[in-house]
């Protein structure tokens, strides 16, 4: 089964990275977190606990806007936690929404709720004393934050398509089952945060193992023709195949991922490989087989090279696929036909086949806060008080008020309009996205969320000047090469390099099935806009009918396509 292109070993020998020691010594993710909670001398978690809390859905951060000032005053950084909820498929009840709204107001520094492009929400600025109450509040309304970060299967995404209600419901149920099946089995989360008793049994992790996965692992369930979840950014993807509106099985695609390391040619973005079709009866077996193969074969000697995409490139997709078949006791059928036509959200009211109405609201950057002229956060809380359906968070950082009966439509719309939740914005703004970056993300090299709104305004001006103001280009900004903003699946992707400076990538497409190539490196906003002015001008004049900007940049030879990223991503 070997292939000359993939000569690598199944297991990489060598000195394990320190994260492997940390996991092994953590007593199944307990570490000293419980003791650290009572240490009032510092606002943060110390030593191994700083990393272990990630398995419990939290990152330790500080406010980078005031970091230098505090250092000058000989003060510690102002530590606070970011907490990310586990919310497979992004669906919440109004009761859950009201609970998180109140917590954000009462118990976080910033008072905001951040919707993310992984279909969940984050709290930023939770002080150490409020961490345990945060987990307990989630538990009281049937939520948790287990395994939303670090070396586990993260929050499972599912296409947000409320119109095809029956098919979406079936896909969503599978997203939930996958999430539950691949969760850590340790009782550490319940013991530490929910005060559940320590049971005198030995912990076991039959799927994840004692040292969990080599690196983060991301899963999607996607319902064509909508690629709103950006499947090619993920390790394991189940593409729904329907017959007569009912789900019959899935195509499996494995090994996508966007994270890179500036200047490290051994890292690259990669689209997922098609493995084949499988019936519903085999989904959990196959998912477990993919995860355990990556668990056993993934590189534990180099975290920069540990994700599933690198394992596939080292051993070869066919070898990896054969191992999955062996472990799952099945053989993939040939891929069944599927097509993507869109990945953006459909804004405004749409009526589902169940005769319920669904209102998709554009939430710029996913940040819900009460702005002076637009009390967005209060508006959603007011809607939650009367809404009879559910809320659906999308992978584009927006929110759907779903399942509204005809009799309630007018009341919901009145609240949305009066709180600034239904303002008219351009198609360009609707199709632009950024990660959080400054001031809270410790990895950010450049601004993203705070940079995007005014940058889009300037891009809109360029598009209007060239007569294409009613069109859109998928535009994304990510503050560092880890790529949370998914810029490396955009038509125009900006990757933060240093404060005020970005690498400009061009040549992705509208549906998210192509990696863009770096066009210019380490340039500032004015240089980016000058380049875009020239290229958007050319696109407006030279494009074919219905040709997207990314497709045009390839056809016109502005950039060469990335065809085999392990070998040509950096060319």
From Swiss-Prot:
This is Sulfite reductase [NADPH] hemoprotein beta-component. Its EC number is 1.8.1.2. Binds 1 siroheme per subunit. Pathway: Sulfur metabolism; hydrogen sulfide biosynthesis; hydrogen sulfide from sulfite (NADPH route): step 1/1. [4Fe-4S] cluster binds at residues 435, 441, 480, 484. InterPro entries: CysI, NiRdtase/SiRdtase_haem-b_fer, Nit/Sulf_reduc_fer-like_dom_sf, NO2/SO3_Rdtase_4Fe4S_dom, NO2/SO3_Rdtase_4Fe4S_prot, NO2/SO3_Rdtase_4Fe4S_sf, NO2/SO3_Rdtase_FeS/sirohaem_BS. Its cofactor is siroheme; [4Fe-4S] cluster. GO terms for biological process: cysteine biosynthetic process; hydrogen sulfide biosynthetic process; sulfate assimilation. GO terms for cellular component: sulfite reductase complex (NADPH). It catalyses: hydrogen sulfide + 3 NADP(+) + 3 H2O = sulfite + 3 NADPH + 4 H(+). Keywords: 4Fe-4S, Amino-acid biosynthesis, Cysteine biosynthesis, Heme, Iron, Iron-sulfur, Metal-binding, NADP, Oxidoreductase. Alpha(8)-beta(8). The alpha component is a flavoprotein, the beta component is a hemoprotein. Coiled coil: none annotated. PROSITE patterns: NIR_SIR. One of its GO terms (molecular function) is 4 iron, 4 sulfur cluster binding. Belongs to the nitrite and sulfite reductase 4Fe-4S domain family. Siroheme binds at residue 484. Transmembrane segments: none annotated. It comes from Erwinia tasmaniensis (strain DSM 17950 / CFBP 7177 / CIP 109463 / NCPPB 4357 / Et1/99). Component of the sulfite reductase complex that catalyzes the 6-electron reduction of sulfite to sulfide. This is one of several activities required for the biosynthesis of L-cysteine from sulfate.
């Amino acid at each position: 089964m070997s292939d000359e292109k993939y000569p690598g070993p199944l297991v990489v020998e060598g000195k394990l990275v320190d994260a492997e020691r940390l996991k092994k010594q953590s007593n199944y993710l307990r570490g000293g977190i419980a003791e650290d909670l009572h240490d009032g001398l510092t606002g943060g978690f110390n030593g191994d606990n700083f990393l272990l809390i990630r398995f419990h859905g939290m990152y330790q951060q500080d406010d980078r806007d005031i970091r230098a000032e505090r250092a000058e005053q000989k003060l510690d950084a102002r530590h606070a936690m970011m907490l990310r909820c586990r919310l497979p498929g992004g669906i919440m009840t109004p009761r859950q929404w009201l609970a998180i709204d109140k917590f954000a107001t009462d118990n976080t520094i910033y008072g905001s709720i951040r919707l993310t492009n992984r279909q969940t929400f984050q709290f930023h600025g939770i002080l150490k004393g409020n961490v345990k109450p945060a987990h307990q509040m989630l538990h009281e309304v049937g939520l948790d934050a287990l395994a939303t970060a670090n070396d586990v299967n993260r929050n499972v995404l599912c296409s947000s398509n409320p119109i095809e209600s029956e098919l979406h419901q079936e896909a969503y149920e599978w997203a939930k089952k996958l999430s539950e099946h691949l969760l850590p089995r340790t009782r550490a989360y319940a013991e530490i945060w929910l005060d559940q008793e320590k049971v005198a049994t030995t912990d076991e992790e039959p799927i994840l193992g004692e040292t969990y996965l080599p690196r983060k692992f991301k899963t999607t369930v996607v319902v064509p023709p909508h690629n709103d979840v950006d499947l090619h950014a993920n390790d394991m993807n189940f593409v729904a195949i329907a017959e007569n509106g009912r789900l019959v099985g899935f195509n499996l695609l494995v090994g996508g991922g966007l994270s890179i390391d500036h200047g490290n040619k051994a890292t690259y973005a990669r689209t997922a490989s098609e493995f084949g079709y499988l019936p519903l009866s085999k989904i959990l077996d196959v998912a477990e087989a993919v995860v355990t193969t990556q668990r056993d074969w993934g590189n534990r000697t180099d975290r920069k090279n540990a994700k599933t995409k690198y394992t596939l490139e080292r051993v070869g997709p066919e070898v990896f696929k054969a191992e999955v078949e062996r472990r799952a006791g099945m053989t993939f059928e040939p891929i069944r036909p599927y097509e993507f036509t869109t990945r953006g959200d459909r804004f405004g009211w749409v009526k589902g086949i169940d005769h319920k109405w669904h209102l998709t609201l554009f939430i710029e950057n996913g940040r819900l806060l009460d702005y002076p002229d637009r009390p967005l956060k209060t508006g959603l809380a007011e809607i939650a008080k009367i809404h009879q359906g559910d809320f659906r968070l999308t992978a584009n950082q927006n929110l759907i008020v779903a399942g509204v009966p005809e009799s309630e439509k007018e009341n919901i719309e009145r609240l949305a309009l009066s709180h600034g939740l239904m303002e008219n914005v351009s198609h360009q703004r609707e199709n632009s996205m950024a990660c959080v970056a400054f001031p809270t993300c410790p990895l950010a090299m450049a601004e993203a969320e705070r940079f995007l709104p005014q940058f889009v305004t300037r891009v809109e001006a360029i598009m209007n000047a060239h007569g294409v103001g009613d069109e859109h280009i998928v535009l994304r900004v990510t503050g560092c090469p880890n790529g949370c903003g998914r810029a490396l699946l955009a038509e125009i992707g900006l990757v933060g390099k240093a404060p005020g400076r970005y690498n400009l990538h061009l040549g992705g497409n509208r549906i998210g099935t192509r990696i863009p190539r770096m066009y210019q490196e380490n340039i500032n906003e004015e240089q980016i806009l000058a380049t875009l002015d020239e290229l958007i001008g050319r696109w407006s004049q030279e494009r074919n009918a219905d040709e997207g900007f990314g497709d045009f940049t390839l056809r016109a030879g502005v950039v060469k396509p990335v065809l085999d990223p392990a070998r040509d991503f950096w060319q």
